[in-house]
Amino acid sequence: MNPNQKIITIGSICMVIGIVSLMLQIGNIISIWVSHSIQTGNQHQAEPISNTNFLTEKAVASVTLAGNSSLCPISGWAVHSKDNSIRIGSKGDVFVIREPFISCSHLECRTFFLTQGALLNDKHSNGTVKDRSPHRTLMSCPVGEAPSPYNSRFESVAWSASACHDGTSWLTIGISGPDNGAVAVLKYNGIITDTIKSWRNNILRTQESECACVNGSCFTVMTDGPSNGQASYKIFKMEKGKVVKSVELDAPNYHYEECSCYPDAGEITCVCRDNWHGSNRPWVSFNQNLEYQIGYICSGVFGDNPRPNDGTGSCGPVSPNGAYGVKGFSFKYGNGVWIGRTKSTNSRSGFEMIWDPNGWTGTDSSFSVKQDIVAITDWSGYSGSFVQHPELTGLDCIRPCFWVELIRGRPKERTIWTSGSSISFCGVNSDTVGWSWPDGAELPFTIDK
């Protein structure tokens, strides 16, 4: 091979190597560009987020909360939650609230509450002793947490409310508007599905605790009319947020307000407040067709406040100290009854649970169990029932639970505001203890001085 041929051969080989190297570099650049494009696309893919925990939402299988089981047998009450919202609110951003209540789905329990459109220790908390204003809204947060703008979910505009879960979605009922023409707005999964207009034009109001769901239908009780005389009371049956049936109670000489309702063996029992003339609590029980029975808890262990000292009860309204009242609850077990009540007979202070083994039908004042919840030297307030379904607990029965509102501020304390925290307990058939779980906040706040 002469020198010219060698030069041509070496040059050709170098050119081939250069071309191959160039092609490999181009391929590498294309590969990097494609990989980068895929990663960038994934980073910018829109994902829905929750407004409470900022985690990507995952599809959750729905169930039907049957409500066909009986209440679990219990021997006492185990502490379930305490939010300490007034103590935390002296320094943190916590809503001014009242009328808190708890309701559970098959996945979680949430605290619902009526805000005043204001925060504790802020100028807008002034005058929040008022029950009904256009600023009041129903909101919710995880149970046991202090309700704040950072963990709470808006539910409805309301100065009276109820909420419950049927196994698929949350139903909320929010009443707002003028006293002589308020409207209840029903929402299902956050979407308005129906409305109920005041039919007596006299402060339409509802439970201030959870509604009750059985086999996909949910039930609530509403009142319209005088708070100190005969009013009108209706039971509503709702499916997916729409009213499918309602019945007005034929209940002369009865007074029902702020009912605490729960399912038991496929039927609903509600224990309510008589603000007219009863120191004992009226009840209404009904089936899924709204066929109902009415009565008063007969026990001589009286459950309302104010009330007389325990004595001889009645299966009708007990008149002494019967005017006014406070929201409360009881759980029926055959002829027996667990009664929740304030310790004081004339002020909203203290709280206790009493087991009267024949108090649903018997009029004596004997009882066999008393469990302390709040000392008589500490403020309490409203109380109400809620339940945990077997789909949540894994039990073969419906667990009874209750919450107690711990009101602070006006009218009993020297502040410019009225608000409250809450505690809750659930029934168990094991060891429990009586104690005092008070609100515990030191008042007044800076804004009050």
Swiss-Prot record:
Subcellular location, record wording: Virion membrane; Host apical cell membrane
Obligatory cofactor(s): Ca(2+)
One GO CC term on file: host cell plasma membrane
One Pfam family this sequence matches: Neur
An annotated Gene Ontology molecular function: exo-alpha-sialidase activity
EC number from the UniProt entry: 3.2.1.18
Glycosylation sites recorded in the entry for this protein: 68, 126, 215
Uppermost EC category: hydrolase
PTM statement from Swiss-Prot or TrEMBL: N-glycosylated.
Hypervariable stalk region: region residues: 36-70
Leader sequence segment: none
Residues annotated as binding Ca(2+): 274, 278, 304
Coiled coil: none
Intravirion side: 1-6
Membrane side Virion surface: residue ranges: 28-449
Domain notes: Intact N-terminus is essential for virion morphogenesis. Possesses two apical sorting signals, one in the ectodomain, which is likely to be a glycan, and the other in the transmembrane domain. The transmembrane domain also plays a role in lipid raft association.
Note: The influenza A genome consist of 8 RNA segments. Genetic variation of hemagglutinin and/or neuraminidase genes results in the emergence of new influenza strains. The mechanism of variation can be the result of point mutations or the result of genetic reassortment between segments of two different strains.
Subunit structure as annotated in this protein's UniProt entry: Homotetramer.
Family, similarity comment: Belongs to the glycosyl hydrolase 34 family.
Protein name: Neuraminidase
